[in-house]
């Protein structure tokens, strides 16, 4: 029996974040990863509380709004031996943080990104997030949303993410398996998680999702894994097409997986051969409290 942390979890009753938290904890435990080598990074929003509520001795970094992927990138590149997992809301990660989201994909850094997708800014009383569809009017909006929705899966595919999946917060066991695969994947991984907000999104509710979601694993012939270069384009196009399926039927599962693309860490090693053995976190930065960096020499070199 695992003893619970004496921390009050203040999410609203029925919040999809409970399922995400549980799936994430189980994924880390079942993979047998030393929790002390796991860093969970979050931004601002209801999802930002994940590191505080995680019932594992992980390292948590609760960062600035929209900057969690930037922080995670610095953590991973300074110490590639760590397992870095990012938790962002759809507003946090796909609004103010969209630039970082896109560039993580093109770099293909070995980081897993979990997007808590509920269509609203739940922490600030339910404004429309980038994933709320045009024409929808949730309870806090005075008028229907007039902007088109961001498609997280399609954006990730176009940006270069090499693992792209979608889960559902109320199907915890299925979500757990997706998170495990995202963590094990070598490269940038996205799990877009459909996460009902019972307080502010009265359209995309548990009842609404329950009769629409279906598993790609149950589709005859569905195979998202790229095993050889000549398959990549076909599997990519297949994933793009499937990512736009929304409405009466909503697919969950793995849309695309390609480990043939070298990670950013691999590419960095081609420029810095000893990077893997002597990465920044292993380097000495001070001697007796004095920095080893000689900035005076740098200033002299740059002085005009």
UniProtKB/Swiss-Prot annotation:
GO terms for molecular function: 2-oxobutyrate synthase activity; 2-oxoglutarate synthase activity; 4 iron, 4 sulfur cluster binding; magnesium ion binding; pyruvate synthase activity; thiamine pyrophosphate binding. Transmembrane segments: none annotated. [4Fe-4S] cluster binds at residues 12, 15, 46, 197. The record marks 125 as: Plays an important role in the binding of CoA. This is 2-oxoacid:ferredoxin oxidoreductase 2, subunit beta. It comes from Sulfurisphaera tokodaii (strain DSM 16993 / JCM 10545 / NBRC 100140 / 7). Mg(2+) binds at residues 90, 118, 120. Its cofactor is [4Fe-4S] cluster; thiamine diphosphate; Mg(2+). Catalyzes the coenzyme A-dependent oxidative decarboxylation of different 2-oxoacids such as 2-oxoglutarate, pyruvate and 2-oxobutyrate to form their CoA derivatives. Keywords: 4Fe-4S, Iron, Iron-sulfur, Magnesium, Metal-binding, Oxidoreductase, Thiamine pyrophosphate. Its EC number is 1.2.7.11. It catalyses: a 2-oxocarboxylate + 2 oxidized [2Fe-2S]-[ferredoxin] + CoA = an acyl-CoA + 2 reduced [2Fe-2S]-[ferredoxin] + CO2 + H(+).
């Amino acid at each position: 029996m695992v003893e619970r942390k004496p921390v009050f979890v203040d999410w609203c009753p029925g919040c999809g974040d409970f399922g995400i938290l549980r799936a994430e904890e189980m994924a880390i435990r079942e993979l047998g990863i030393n929790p002390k080598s796991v860093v969970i990074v979050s931004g601002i929003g209801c999802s930002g509380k994940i590191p505080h509520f995680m019932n594992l001795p992980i390292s948590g970094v609760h960062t600035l709004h929209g900057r969690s992927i930037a922080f995670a990138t610095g953590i991973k590149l300074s110490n590639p031996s760590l397992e870095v997992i990012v938790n962002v809301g759809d507003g946090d990660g796909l609004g103010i943080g969209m630039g970082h989201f896109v560039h993580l994909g093109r770099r293909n850094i070995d980081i897993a990104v979990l997007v808590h997708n509920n269509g609203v800014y739940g922490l600030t009383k339910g404004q429309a997030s980038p994933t709320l569809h045009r024409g929808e009017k949730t309870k806090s909006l005075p008028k229907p949303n007039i902007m088109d929705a961001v498609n997280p899966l399609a954006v990730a595919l176009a940006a270069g993410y090499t693992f792209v999946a979608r889960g559902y917060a109320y199907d915890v066991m299925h979500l757990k398996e997706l998170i495990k695969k995202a963590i094990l994947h070598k490269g940038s991984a996205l799990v877009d998680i459909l996460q009902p907000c019972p307080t502010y999104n009265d359209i995309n509710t548990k009842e609404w999702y329950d009769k629409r979601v279906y598993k790609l694993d149950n589709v005859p012939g569905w195979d998202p894994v790229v095993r050889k270069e000549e398959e990549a384009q076909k599997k990519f196009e297949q994933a793009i097409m499937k990512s736009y399926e929304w409405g009466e039927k909503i697919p969950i599962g793995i849309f695309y997986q390609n480990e043939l693309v070298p990670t950013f860490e691999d590419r960095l090693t081609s420029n810095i051969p000893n990077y893997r053995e002597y990465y920044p976190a292993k380097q000495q930065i001070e001697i007796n409290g004095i920095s080893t960096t000689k900035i005076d020499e740098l200033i002299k070199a740059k002085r005009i």
